[in-house]
Amino acid sequence: MDPLAALLDGPRAHGAFLLRSVLTPPWSLRIEDGAPLTLMATVRGEAWVVPDDGEAVLMREGDIAIARGPDPYLVADDPATPPQVLILPGQECRTPDGGHLTELADVGVRTWGHGVDGPSILLTGTYGMAGEVSKKLLAALPALIVLRAAEWTSPLVPLLAEEIVKDVPGQEAVLDRLLDLLLIASLRTWFDRPGSDAPAWYRAHHDPVVGQALKLLQHQPAEPWTVAKLAANAGVSRAAFARRFTETVGEPPMTYLAAWRLALAADLLRQHPDSTIGAVAHQVGYGSSFALSAAFKREFGLSPQQYRAS
């Protein structure tokens, strides 16, 4: 399994917030929603992304930006344009002084802005909840990534632009998966660039010893894995395997496995709402619902029942 796909095959977009914005200069949006990760694609025109503690970056048509939260940032036609809209948690939109918006409004299915057409069109996809994106992935990302249109070729942005305005049964699930695919494809391109400082866990999948162990852990999480068993499968000594895994991945094998099992459990809780906590626990390698619940709450701050209901 591809390392990025593996990370997003656990917790992933679930009823993600997706929006098509149609904007006419001057415009400026201050984002303070606290979302862990937001993906933006410029379909038409240009947009500046201005982190509070970083350099302003210009997005041109076809470019993609990935902003890692929860720090606020500005998206505008010009860095000097004063904020006109404040976007708060839950995607609540207000004027900077807390009033109701009057200049921008819904102008179609998942479409918002100054009118039905305009010189700037942006697509935004937000992973709004903790646990929807791996902590390991978030820790590897800078506050802002901009991937230029010239750096890659993908049909995903035009497809998302086409699908985002459809109001048909099952469309939320379609958009969630498209957002995941676009994120994975964008980050893969980013990490594979010449000279890229890809994180250790990404490079580890290319290691002949550690890569094989990662595949076993990801595909068979319910197995009673031990360091000795993984080492035997890799054909190396226990000590050599533990040292190589920790050096390559950045954490010991059992620590990695524990986090992976919880990531899968989080996904299963939402994918299969009728499954008992005990059934989910056994699927991911926990001996009881109590053991899973205790570990889950330590990781996510919520019980499995609370996470499923959120």
Please identify what each model-predicted range represents.
Residues 1-65, 71-114:
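Generic protein-terminus/edge-of-domain signal
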Residues 39, 45, 62, 125, ...:
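Short hydrophobic/aromatic patches on the structural cores and recognition surfaces of FHA
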Residues 51-55, 267-280, 285-288:
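Short, charged helix-to-loop "capping" segments that act as catalytic/coupling loops
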Residues 65-68, 122-124:
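Short hydrophobic-aromatic micro-motifs
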Residues 99-181, 185-186, 190, 194, ...:
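Amphipathic alpha-helical segments enriched in hydrophobic/aromatic residues interleaved with Lys/Arg
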Residues 149-165, 175-179, 183, 187, ...:
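A short, Lys/Arg-enriched amphipathic alpha-helix from helix-turn-helix/homeodomain DNA-binding modules
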Residues 181, 185-191, 212-219, 223-263, ...:
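Basic/polar phosphate-binding segments, predominantly the helix-turn-helix DNA-binding elements
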